[in-house]
Amino acid sequence: MAIKDWPEGEGPRDKLLVKGAAHLSDAELLAVLLRNGLSGLNAVDLARSLIHEFGGLRSLLCAPKHQVCRLPGVGPVKYAQLQAAAELARRVAQENLQRGQVLTNPDLTRDYLMRQLADRSYEVFAILLLDSQHRVIQFVELFRGTIDSASVYPREVVSLVLEKKAAAVIVCHNHPSGIAEPSQADRRITERLKNALATIDVSLLDHMVVGDREIVSFAERGWIN
C-alpha cells in the first residue's frame, strides 16, 4: 500500500512532525530521506530492503555509489540524499569536538572517532592534537591504506605535532574488518610513536582502534604507561 493511502498521521513524515524523529524506526527515518519507493514497494518497504541488504544503516551510508545504485529504486539522486545525511552527521560530531574544547568525557571522544572512522573500506590512521590543558587543537588524518609498522612514519607525526604546537596526542585508526582487537603491529606502532613523541616531551595519551561497533583503548588496557 502506498504511504499516501495510510491512515492520517501514520506515515513516517507525519509521525516525525507530530511525535519527533526519535519515535521513528530506522526504516521510517530512511523513508523520509528516500521520499518515495518504486512499483510494488512504498518508501518504508524500500528502506527496510536497503537496511537488510547492507546489514544496517551505517554500512548502507558508507557503501560506495556503485553498490547502492545497482539496487532497484535507488538512483544517483537518492544516493546523493543519503550521502548528504551521512555527511551532516559527521559534521555534527565534528562540532562536538571543537577547537578549544577540553576532553573530559571519554564517551564523546569515542563517539566522534566512531563516526569518523567506522565502516571505512580502507584503513585510516589519524591523530587528535591537544594542548597542555587537553583542549582540542585539530583532528588530522595522516595515512590511508594498509596501516602497519612500516607505513606509519613517526617523523611525520612528530613534525605535525611540532607544527601545531601540541602538548599531547591521541592516535587512532580503524580496522575495515570491523573487529577492533589490536594486532601486534598496532602495539609496535604505538611503542614507536610513544618513544618518538617522548623525545620532544609530548605525551601519547591513548591509541584507539575503531571497529564496527566498538573501540579498543590502549590506555584502558594498560598498554600505555
Curated annotation (Swiss-Prot):
**Where is Zn(2+) annotated to bind?**
H173, H175, D186
Which GO molecular-function terms appear in the entry? metal ion binding; metallopeptidase activity
Q: Which family does it belong to?
A: Belongs to the UPF0758 family.
Motif JAMM motif, per the record, lies over 173-186
Annotated coiled-coil positions are none
Q: Which organism is it from?
A: Shewanella sp. (strain ANA-3)
Q: Which InterPro entries match?
A: MPN, RadC_JAB, RuvA_2-like, UPF0758, UPF0758_CS, UPF0758_N
Query: What are the leading ranks of the lineage?
Result: Bacteria, Pseudomonadati, Pseudomonadota, Gammaproteobacteria, Alteromonadales
Pinpoint the MPN domain residues.
102-224
Protein keywords = Hydrolase, Metal-binding, Metalloprotease, Protease, Zinc
Q: Which GO terms describe its biological process?
A: proteolysis
The signal peptide stretch is none
Reading the lineage from the top rank, the first entry is Bacteria
**Which Pfam families does the annotation name?**
RadC (PF04002), UPF0758_N (PF20582)
Q: Which PANTHER family match?
A: DNA REPAIR PROTEIN RADC, UPF0758 PROTEIN YEES-RELATED
Question: Under what name is this protein listed?
Answer: UPF0758 protein Shewana3_3770
Transmembrane segment boundaries? none
Instruction: Supply the NCBIfam families for this chain.
Output: PRK00024.1, radc
